[in-house]
C-alpha cells in the first residue's frame, strides 16, 4: 500500500475513534475516481440506517464522478436520513480532504436539513 493511502487510512481511523467516543450517528463518505457513496451509520451497532450513491437508480442517469453528482448524493442522503428519523450526525470524511466532491456532498446535506 502506498504512503498516501496509508496516511488517509490512518486519518480515517483516528477520526472514527473520536466519533465513536461521541456516541453519535455518523454520515460516512467514501469516494472513488468514478463514484461517491454516503451512509448514515448507527452508533450502537454499526448498522446502516440510510445510504445513497451515484449508483442509485435515481442518480444513475447523470454524471457520476463530479461535484454535481456529489451534490445530488448529499441531497438524497439527507432526505433518506430524515425519513429514517435522523436529523443530527457526525461527519466522517474517511480521511479524505474536506474539498471538492466531499465538501459538495456535505454542503448539500446541510442545506437539505442535516445538522453536523
Curated annotation (Swiss-Prot):
Keyword set includes rRNA-binding: yes
> Would you name any one GO CC term?
cytosolic large ribosomal subunit
Instruction: Provide a GO biological process annotation.
Output: translation
Which CDD domains does this UniProt record tie to the protein?
A: Ribosomal_L18_L5e
Q: What GO molecular functions are on record for this protein?
A: 5S rRNA binding; structural constituent of ribosome
InterPro entries in UniProt: Ribosomal_uL18_bac-type, Ribosomal_uL18_bac/euk
Q: Which UniProt keywords apply?
A: Ribonucleoprotein, Ribosomal protein, RNA-binding, rRNA-binding
The record, for NCBIfam families, names:
L18_bact
Q: What does this protein do?
A: This is one of the proteins that bind and probably mediate the attachment of the 5S RNA into the large ribosomal subunit, where it forms part of the central protuberance.
Q: What family name appears in the similarity comment?
A: Belongs to the universal ribosomal protein uL18 family.
Complexes and interactors: Part of the 50S ribosomal subunit; part of the 5S rRNA/L5/L18/L25 subcomplex. Contacts the 5S and 23S rRNAs.
The UniProt entry, under PANTHER family, shows:
39S RIBOSOMAL PROTEIN L18, MITOCHONDRIAL, LARGE RIBOSOMAL SUBUNIT PROTEIN UL18M
Could you identify this protein by its name? Large ribosomal subunit protein uL18
Which species is the source of this protein?
Teredinibacter turnerae (strain ATCC 39867 / T7901)
Its organism's taxonomic lineage begins at: Bacteria, Pseudomonadati, Pseudomonadota, Gammaproteobacteria, Cellvibrionales
